[in-house]
């Protein structure tokens, strides 16, 4: 689950700063340099930019695999064939010398050092072969709906199935897509991937409509508090989306598809209002503190670090106590809401998800759901939190993987929805 917490790693922290290296007005090292930082089983792409402006050379660092751009650096030394920079807030340094046309150096952070060779040129734009290309064979409609309780207006895209539009007399099934934690646009975009766009496109080609929306105060959505907001606030946004779809009187069924925190929100709603079905993509099935302690230990273990975090130790961390969203989440146990959900549920996860551990959460959901032949709980081998085929499941891989979402998952979701009677 892409939780609003700081994952403890030995890698770059996502902090954006700006800094100028005050040096001679030119250097032969001007331009972009890129390479891979190999740390154990993880490979992290780094890009160094040296740009000249107003008699200064500005040096910034990108970490595209982490979604970080423009990390400012402070110059310790810079010449035509060598450089030394640091990012003090991150405890990071890089010292390199030009050798055979490459910057051959050492990257160090928090007492650990690794070789890092950079070659001229920026990294190529990542390939995303599942990205839908226009013109689409289906109709789309820009819509807004209102959460009056929180004074929030949510903007989104209603995607009609192939052969349908708002004038059609036949009523298709529609799915409201609810994103994971953190403010995201309607496509749930991250690292160049647009999972919700890919899902909406696939569903439309299988006869299923969908509505995806920008999270409150994001994209074209306006209003609604963010300060001190919790999943209950975001639940009301999704609830307004369900109401909007039902008021159209254009759909035979109105269901929810939630990813990560969106799966939690789906069960919150499933226990409280009419919902025709739920698809929970890597949604929680256990109490928040239990989930996050397990998440922390899985990430630490995969990173080659000690994995001995207890639930109580997690709860005592400073960032937990100072974050209202996180405080609500660790105290929330979804058991009662899952037990009270009477609609059909398809709960799925990948066995390499290191954010919402599949075995822990799917087993809980399976035991808690009311008995129904329509329910399906499935664990997919080799898939991560985004349902990509992966190596380790660590979040640093997300942007490096070309696949946005497993075709098997897309097919299973569409077939399950279409199989509901």
Task: Specify the residue positions occupied by each region the protein language model found.
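Central antiparallel beta-sheet cores of small beta-barrel/beta-sandwich binding domains
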Residues: 23-99, 104-110, 130, 138, ...
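N-terminal cap/lid segment of alpha/beta-hydrolase-fold proteins
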Residues: 123-170
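Short, surface-exposed "cap/lid" segments of acyl-processing enzymes
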Residues: 164-202
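Alpha/beta-hydrolase active-site loop
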Residues: 195, 227-248
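Accessory cap/linker subdomain of secreted extracellular hydrolases
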Residues: 268-269, 273-340, 355, 371
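Short beta-strand/loop motif that positions the catalytic acidic residue
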Residues: 341, 347-349
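Short alpha-helix in the alpha/beta-hydrolase fold that links the catalytic acid
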Residues: 343, 354-368
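Catalytic active-site module of serine/aspartate enzymes centered on a nucleophile-bearing elbow/loop
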Residues: 386, 392-421
């Amino acid at each position: 689950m892409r939780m609003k917490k700081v994952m403890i790693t030995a890698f770059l922290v996502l902090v954006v700063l700006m800094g100028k290296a005050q040096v001679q007005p030119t250097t032969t090292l001007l331009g972009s340099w890129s390479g891979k930082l190999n740390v154990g089983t993880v490979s992290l792409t780094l890009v160094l930019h040296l740009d000249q402006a107003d008699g200064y050379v500005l040096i910034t660092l990108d970490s595209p695999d982490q979604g970080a751009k423009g990390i400012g650096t402070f110059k310790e030394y810079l010449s035509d064939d060598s450089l030394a920079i640091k990012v003090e807030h991150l405890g990071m340094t890089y010292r390199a010398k030009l050798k055979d046309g490459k910057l051959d150096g050492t990257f160090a952070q928090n007492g650990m050092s690794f070789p890092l060779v950079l070659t001229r040129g920026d990294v190529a734009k990542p390939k995303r072969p599942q990205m839908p290309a226009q013109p689409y064979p289906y109709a789309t409609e820009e819509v807004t709906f209102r959460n009056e309780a929180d004074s929030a207006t949510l903007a989104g895209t209603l995607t009609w199935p192939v052969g349908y539009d708002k004038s059609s007399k036949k009523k298709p099934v529609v799915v409201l897509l609810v994103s994971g934690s953190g403010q995201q646009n309607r496509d749930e975009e991250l690292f160049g991937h647009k999972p919700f766009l890919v899902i909406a496109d696939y569903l439309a080609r299988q006869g299923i409509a969908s509505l995806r929306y920008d999270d409150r105060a994001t994209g074209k959505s306006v209003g609604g508090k963010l300060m001190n907001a919790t999943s209950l606030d975001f639940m009301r946004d999704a609830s307004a989306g369900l109401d909007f779809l039902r008021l159209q009187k254009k759909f035979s069924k109105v269901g929810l598809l939630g990813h990560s925190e969106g799966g939690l929100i789906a069960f919150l709603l499933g226990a409280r209002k009419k919902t025709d079905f739920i698809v929970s993509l890597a949604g929680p099935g256990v109490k928040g503190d239990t989930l996050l302690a397990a998440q922390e230990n899985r990430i630490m273990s995969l990173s080659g670090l000690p994995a001995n975090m207890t639930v109580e130790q997690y709860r005592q961390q400073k960032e937990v106590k100072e974050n209202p969203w996180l405080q609500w989440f660790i105290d929330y146990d979804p058991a009662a809401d899952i037990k009270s959900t009477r609609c059909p549920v398809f709960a799925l996860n990948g066995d390499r998800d290191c954010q919402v551990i599949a075995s822990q959460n799917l087993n809980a959901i399976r035991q808690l759901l009311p008995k129904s032949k329509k329910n399906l709980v499935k664990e997919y081998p080799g898939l991560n939190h985004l349902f990509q085929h992966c190596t380790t499941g660590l979040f640093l891989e997300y942007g490096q993987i070309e696949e946005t979402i497993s075709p098997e998952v897309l097919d299973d979701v569409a077939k399950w929805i279409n199989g509901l009677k």
